[in-house]
Amino acid sequence: EYEDPDFYIVEELSRKIEEALQRLPDSYREAFELNRFQHMTYGEIATCLEVSSKTVDYRIQQALKLLRVELKDYLPILLAIL
């Protein structure tokens, strides 16, 4: 068992982020995850997905916008534990 209360907060926050990611449209989530988790550039993602870099930029910006709205209530928690 973990005794650090921050562990449970981080675990809950991670779960909420994962749930929010799953609710994104597939095209937004794919571009976002390739950029943020696979560290691919917009150009690399564009080549991989066979779309323009502008389309990749749009999809990632939309994903961020939706995630900000969805996770806005958790920002104070995140800031408190950092």
Indicate where each model-derived feature is located.
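Acidic, proline/glycine-rich intrinsically disordered inter-domain spacer in sigma factors
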Residues: E1-E19
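Generic non-transmembrane alpha-helical segments
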Residues: K16, A20-L24, E70-Y74
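Helix-turn-helix DNA-binding module
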Residues: E19-Q22, D26, E30, Q38-T55
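C-terminal edge and immediately downstream basic/flexible tail or linker adjoining helix-turn-helix-like DNA-binding
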Residues: C48, L64-L82
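Residues within the DNA-recognition helix of helix-turn-helix
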Residues: R59-Q62
